[in-house]
């Protein structure tokens, strides 16, 4: 099984470290990852117009649009992406609850916290949630549907 993960952190040095550790934690559970890295919330949101991610690993304190604001915007989009905050801003953990994240990973305790979040993901997210999606490009952006939500598809003109 392979899942798509978006990693968003303004610290360029942290991106490869977090990506590598997250990839290892998921592989230990038999889940392979495709991790895309973003250095701003704006870049992440732009990418999400074209791509669906299963999980977003999101720093909180970033210039411009902070991680809480990005999380709120993701919830407004309503695609069911799981948000995991990865941050040194431990004092903002309660503020993150407004976004209903899957978890909060402290950078100071990263390896233990990421392992716990991966375990939670495996236990709470059914096979259907981790895969079995169809994506359609529309004029207004990317539309993602669970295959069980689709009752009928009709093509016209040059569509197949």
Model regions and ranges:
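A generic structural motif
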Residues: 26-35, 81
């Amino acid at each position: 099984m392979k899942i798509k993960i978006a990693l968003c952190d303004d610290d360029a040095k942290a991106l490869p470290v977090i990506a590598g550790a997250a990839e290892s934690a998921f592989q230990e559970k038999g889940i392979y990852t495709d991790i895309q890295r973003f250095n701003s919330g704006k870049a992440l949101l732009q990418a999400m117009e074209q791509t669906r991610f299963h999980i977003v690993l999101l720093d909180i304190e970033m210039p411009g649009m902070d991680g809480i604001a990005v999380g709120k915007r993701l919830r407004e989009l309503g695609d069911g992406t799981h948000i995991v905050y990865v941050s040194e801003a431990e004092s903002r953990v309660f503020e993150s609850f407004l976004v209903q994240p899957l978890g909060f990973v402290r950078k100071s305790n990263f390896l233990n916290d990421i392992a716990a979040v991966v375990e939670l993901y495996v236990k709470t997210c059914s096979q259907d949630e981790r895969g079995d999606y169809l994506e359609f490009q529309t004029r207004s952006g990317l539309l993602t549907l669970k295959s069980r939500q689709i009752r009928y598809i009709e093509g016209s003109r040059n569509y197949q």
